[in-house]
Amino acid sequence: MRAIFISDLHLGEQDEATEARFEAFMRDVAPQANRLYVLGDLLHVWLGDALLARDAYARSICARFAELALRGTKVFIARGNRDFMIAAAFAKACGAELLPSETIVTLGRHRALLLHGDELCTDDVAYQRARRVLRSAAFRVFGNSLPVFLRAALARRLRRASEAHKAGTALNIMDANVDAIAKVMARHGVDCLIHGHTHRPAHHVLSGARERWVLSDWQQDYGYLVWEEGHFAVHPWPASTTQPASL
C-alpha cells in the first residue's frame, strides 16, 4: 500500500507556480497512490461550500480529485485554518472523504495520528482564541448565512488579520508546542504524528520510539510524504536529482 500525504497548498491565491505544481502532481504522482491524504489548507481561503457555484477554479480543483478517485485512489481531505469551512458538498465534488480534525490510521506497524497542526501551536494564545471562535458551530452558521459578496469581504479581512498577527509574532511562538505534541500522542496512544500548518518540514525522532513528520508547504519547500512497504520517505516536488529522505 502506498499512501501520500500533502498539506498547505494554499490554492486559489492566484499563484501560477503553485497551481502548475498541483496540476503536475495530480497528473504524475497522485495516481501512483492507493491513498492520498490532504491535511488542511488545500485552499488559501474557503468560507462555505456555497462558493462552489461561483468559483470555477475551486470546481476545477474538485474535478482533479474526482478524476483521481475514479481511477482508484482513495482521497481524504482534512480542514485547515484557511479552509476550515470545507464541508460535505466540497468533499463530495472531490470524490473524497472529509476527515475529522483528528484521524488515526494504521500504516504497517505504525498507529499514526493525522492533524492539520494548528491546534498544536498552543503558545500562540491569541491565535488559539481566534481559532476557537472561527471553528465554532455559531461561526459556521453565521458564515454560511452570509451572501457570497460579504463572504469575500470577510475572507479579505481575515487574511489581513492573519498577516498582521504573523508579522507581529515571534516564529517560535507560532510553532508546535512540545507538550501539546506529547499530550495529543499520549491521548490517542499513537507512535507517529503527521501534520502540516507550520511550514517547517521536518522529521522529529521522539522518545519511546515515536516520531513526528511535519509536511512542507507548496510555496517554499515543495514536497510530499510517502509511506510504502513499511517506510516513510520525503520526496521533493517537482522531482529533482535529490534522493528522497527516508527512514
Regions found by a protein language model. Give the residues of each.
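Core catalytic region of metal-dependent phosphoesterases/phosphodiesterases
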Residues: 2, 11-107
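Residue-level marker for buried hydrophobic side chains located in beta-strands
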Residues: 3-5, 36-38, 113, 194
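A structural signal for the main folded, soluble domain(s) of proteins
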Residues: 5, 9, 238-242, 247
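Generic beta-strand structural signal
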Residues: 5, 38, 106-107, 203-205, ...
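Active-site glycine-centered loops adjacent to acidic/histidine catalytic or metal-binding residues
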Residues: 8, 41, 80, 116, ...
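A short, polar/proline- and glycine-enriched secondary-structure boundary/capping micro-motif
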Residues: 16, 123-126, 242-247
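Conserved beta-sheet core of the metallophosphoesterase superfamily
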Residues: 93-100, 111, 118, 124-129, ...
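Active-site-proximal loop/helix segment associated with metal-binding centers of metalloenzymes
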Residues: 115-176
